[in-house]
Design a protein with these regions (language model features):
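A sequence-level/structural motif corresponding to short, flexible coil/turn segments enriched
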Residues: 16-446
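Sec-dependent N-terminal signal peptides
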Residues: 4-13
C-alpha cells in the first residue's frame, strides 16, 4: 500500500492570512503551517468524517467509501461501506477495516472503549453482509469492534423512514450515548420510552433522536425532541453534571421549540441523564442556520459552533453569504455571546477543538464566490481558523485547489500538532491523488 507524504513547500497551495493583529507574546509557539498531507482511497468516492486520538498515542478515522480498489482493494461490495482506519503515533497507517452490506452505509462517529476496542456510529440501508437488520430506509447503525477493528456485534435502531446518526460518546457510567434524527412521521410516533409524554401528533418528519445503550447494544432509553417540521441533531456531549447537550438545526416553530427565529435555527437542547428535556434554545434568523459541534468550557458554559446565512434575529453581524457562528451559552441556557467568523466570502464550519491556552481551532470549508464565473468549477477550500475563545480571529489558513474540498473533523495531539481529516476532490498540484472523485485526506498543522 502506497502512502503519499507531501511536504507543502508550494507557496501557491498554502494560503495564510492575518485577519486581526494580535499580541502573540502570551501564546505558546505555533508554527502556523501545514506540515504534511496524506491522501487515501480508490477510484470512487471516499470521505473521512471523524477522528479520535487512541490510547496507544495514535489515531483512528471513520468515514465511508465506495471504492473497491486502491487502499480499499480488499472490499468486494459495490456501494458505500463504513470504514475504520488506524494509525500509529508516527501517523503511519496500521490497518483498514470496512463494514456494510449491498446498500448505502455511512460512518460518522467513533469512540474508543476501555478494552481499546471501538464503538462506531452512522446509518445503514443494508440488511445483508455485516448489517443483520434494516427496518425501512436508513437506520441508525452501531458497530462494536475489538482493538484490531474486528466486528464483535452490530445493531440497527430505526423505523420505516430515513433515520440517521452522527455522533457517539462513552458516558461516565460506562454506557454509550448516540444522537441523530428520526423520521417520526414514518415511525408513527414510535422511537421513545413510554415514560415520555410526547405523542406522534406533536412531531413531524425529523426530530432530534437520542439513545443510551449498554456496551452490548441493549437499549437503556431513547427519546426524540422537536416540533412538527424538520429537526436534526449532529453533535452531543455529556456535561460535567451528567446531563447531555445536543446541537443541530430546527425548522419547527412549535412544541418543544419555544422561541424560534424563523427559517432554520441553530437548536440547542439540554436533557438529563434519563433523556428528559431540561431546556432548549434557538439561535438564528430567517435563513438557514445550523449547529455542528459543541464543547463545555472550564467555566461550565457551552460553546456552540455552527453556520448561518442570516443577518437578523439574534445574528446581526453577517460578514458574507455564509458565516461561521460561535455562540456561548450558560449552563442554564442563556445566550451570553454570539460571534460571526469569516470573510466577505462563504465559510462553513464542521468541528472545533480548544487548545490548553484557551484558543480555538475551527475547521470547515470556504470559497470566494466573487472570483467564480458561470463556467468555472466552484473552488471550495479546506479552511482552518485559529481564534480566541470569544471568536476573535488570530489566523486563517486554507488548503486546496479546484473542486470541493472540506475539513470535517480535527484533533489536537499530545505533541501539539493538529490533525485534520476530510475529503479532497480533483487533483491538486503537489498532492498525489488516485482520481478526480473525493479522496480521504489527513493533514498535519503545527
Amino acid at each position: 500500500m502506497k502512502i503519499t507524504l507531501v511536504f507543502l513547500s508550494l507557496i501557491f497551495f498554502l494560503r495564510c492570512d492575518i485577519i486581526e493583529e494580535t499580541n502573540w507574546s502570551f501564546l505558546p509557539p505555533v508554527k502556523n503551517e501545514w506540515e504534511s498531507v496524506n491522501t487515501f482511497g480508490g477510484s470512487e468516492e471516499d470521505i473521512a468524517n471523524a477522528i479520535i486520538l487512541t490510547k496507544d498515542g495514535g489515531f483512528a478515522i471513520i468515514g465511508n467509501t465506495k471504492s473497491t480498489d486502491g487502499d480499499f482493494y480488499f472490499k468486494n461490495r459495490e456501494g458505500s461501506d463504513v470504514f475504520l482506519m488506524k494509525f500509529n503515533n508516527l501517523s503511519e497507517l496500521q490497518w483498514i477495516k470496512t463494514y456494510g452490506g449491498s446498500d448505502d452505509d455511512r460512518g460518522h462517529g467513533l469512540v474508543q472503549l476501555p478494552d481499546e476496542g471501538y464503538a462506531l456510529i452512522g446509518y445503514s440501508k443494508s440488511n445483508d453482509g455485516d448489517a443483520s437488520e434494516n427496518k425501512g430506509q436508513h437506520d441508525n447503525w452501531v458497530i462494536r469492534t475489538d482493538v484490531k477493528g474486528e466486528l464483535l456485534w452490530e445493531k440497527s435502531f430505526g423505523f420505516l423512514g430515513h433515520d440517521h446518526a452522527y455522533n457517539i460518546i462513552k458516558t461516565n457510567d460506562g454506557a454509550l450515548f448516540f444522537n441523530g434524527f428520526l423520521d417520526v412521521t414514518a415511525s408513527n410516533g414510535l422511537g421513545q420510552n413510554k415514560i415520555f409524554s410526547n405523542s406522534s401528533s406533536r412531531h413531524g418528519v425529523g426530530e432530534f433522536w437520542a439513545h443510551k445503550i449498554d456496551l452490548e447494544g441493549n437499549l437503556l432509553w431513547r427519546n426524540y425532541y422537536g416540533g412538527t417540521s424538520n429537526d436534526r441533531s449532529y453533535d452531543s456531549i455529556e456535561t460535567s453534571t451528567g446531563d447531555f447537550i445536543l446541537v443541530g438545526t430546527s425548522e419547527s416553530q412549535d412544541q418543544d421549540i419555544k422561541n424560534p427565529n424563523g427559517g432554520y435555527d441553530i437548536w440547542v437542547i439540554k436533557i438529563d441523564k434519563n433523556g428528559k428535556l431540561i431546556w432548549e434554545k434557538s439561535i438564528g434568523g430567517t435563513e438557514y442556520d445550523s449547529g455542528t459541534s459543541v464543547m463545555e468550557l472550564p467555566s461550565g458554559d457551552f460553546l456552540i459552533l455552527g453556520n448561518s446565512f442570516s443577518n437578523n434575529g439574534n445574528i446581526l453581524n453577517a460578514l458574507g453569504s455564509s458565516d461561521i457562528i460561535l455562540s456561548k451559552i450558560s449552563s442554564n441556557g442563556e445566550i451570553k455571546e454570539i460571534k460571526n467568523i469569516g470573510t466577505t466570502s462563504f465559510e462553513t464550519a464542521n468541528s472545533f477543538v480548544r487548545r490548553p491556552d484557551g484558543t480555538l481551532l475551527i475547521v470547515g470549508h470556504s470559497n470566494n464566490e466573487s472570483n467564480i464565473s458561470d463556467d468555472q468549477m466552484i473552488e471550495n477550500d479546506i479552511v482552518l481558523f485559529y481564534t480566541f475563545e470569544n471568536g476573535a480571529v488570530i489566523k486563517k489558513n486554507s488548503l486546496g485547489n479546484l473542486g470541493f474540498d472540506s475539513g470535517n473533523d480535527l484533533v489536537h495531539d499530545h505533541n501539539g500538532r493538529l490533525i485534520v481529516v476530510g475529503s479532497m476532490e480533483n487533483i491538486s498540484e503537489g498532492i498525489v491523488k488516485r482520481d478526480s472523485n473525493k479522496n480521504i485526506f489527513i493533514a498535519i498543522w503545527h
